[in-house]
């Protein structure tokens, strides 16, 4: 079964990150009398740790190799392969009819999300949502579950027909100092107040990535994880930095970021609109 998260095509947002580093808590020692527990996560409206190719204006989200989940403050083994379905093994866990399940690779505790200020992506189309703060939750019954997600996402559909320099990073900042990424505790089906910053940078490594020559409705060029916030009264600044030192700046009206939803930002970049580095004399 394949599921799709429908893209809200809105021009956009801004997002921010948290400057705080936090270690993921270690796997909790299991008390005597526990048994091996296996929970299976299926494709669903919110299930994802990476984007698949878009079809008919929708993007499927899939499990990725290395993913793990939490149940009763205990971490599962990481999965070896991704896909629309994944089986998570807990070597020793208290048996129960239901389990509260969390997908969280970055937070300091199972039910605390941490969306970092510095996010990374190593290549075009190779998204890193889990390590960039993606946070999911579910109730497992009869050994199965389907994730819902408390974080939001932006799909960068950035392209150019004449910019040849590689893109090094994208930085989004929001006016008014609103916190749009950082650390937030999960309770009552949503993330609570977020403690973090009002900007976030998605970096593409030292060499950067080449921009595609045209917009693409099926391949996701880049994506970022965001804290869901009402940015409808904010102004968003988006800075694209290139390997030759040039910069492209956008300013847009903010939008409301909805948990579990993706906002697409289609941006044509023209060489004539770049701010070029100053040549010293």
Regions found by a protein language model. Name each.
Residues 7-14:
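Bacterial N-terminal signal peptides
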Residues 2-5, 18-274:
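Sec-type signal peptide cleavage vicinity
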Residues 273-281:
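Single conserved hydrophobic/aromatic residue that forms the stacking wall/gate
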């Amino acid at each position: 079964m394949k599921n799709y998260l429908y893209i809200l095509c809105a021009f956009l947002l801004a997002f921010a990150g948290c400057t705080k580093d936090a270690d993921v808590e270690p796997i909790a020692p299991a008390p005597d009398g526990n048994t091996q527990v296996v929970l299976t996560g299926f494709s669903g409206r919110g299930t994802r740790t990476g984007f698949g190719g878009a079809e008919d204006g929708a993007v499927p989200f899939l499990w990725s190799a290395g993913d793990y989940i939490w149940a009763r403050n205990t971490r599962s083994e990481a999965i070896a392969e991704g896909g629309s379905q994944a089986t998570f093994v807990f070597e020793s866990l208290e048996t129960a009819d239901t389990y509260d399940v969390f997908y969280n690779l970055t937070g300091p505790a199972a039910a605390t999300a941490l969306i970092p200020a510095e996010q990374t992506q190593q290549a075009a189309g190779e998204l890193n949502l889990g390590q960039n703060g993606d946070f999911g939750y579910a109730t497992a019954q009869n050994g199965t579950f389907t994730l819902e997600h408390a974080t939001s996402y932006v799909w960068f559909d950035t392209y150019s027909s004449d910019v040849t320099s590689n893109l090094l990073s994208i930085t989004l900042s929001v006016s008014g100092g609103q916190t749009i990424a950082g650390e937030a505790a999960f309770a009552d089906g949503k993330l609570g107040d977020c403690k973090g910053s009002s900007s976030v940078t998605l970096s593409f490594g030292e060499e950067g990535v080449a921009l595609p020559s045209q917009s693409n409705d099926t391949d996701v060029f880049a994506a970022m994880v965001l804290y869901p916030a009402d940015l409808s009264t904010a102004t968003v600044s988006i800075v694209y930095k290139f390997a030759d030192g040039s910069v492209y700046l956008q300013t847009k009206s903010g939008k409301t970021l909805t948990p579990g939803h993706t906002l697409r930002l289609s941006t044509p970049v023209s060489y004539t609109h770049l701010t070029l580095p100053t040549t010293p004399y």
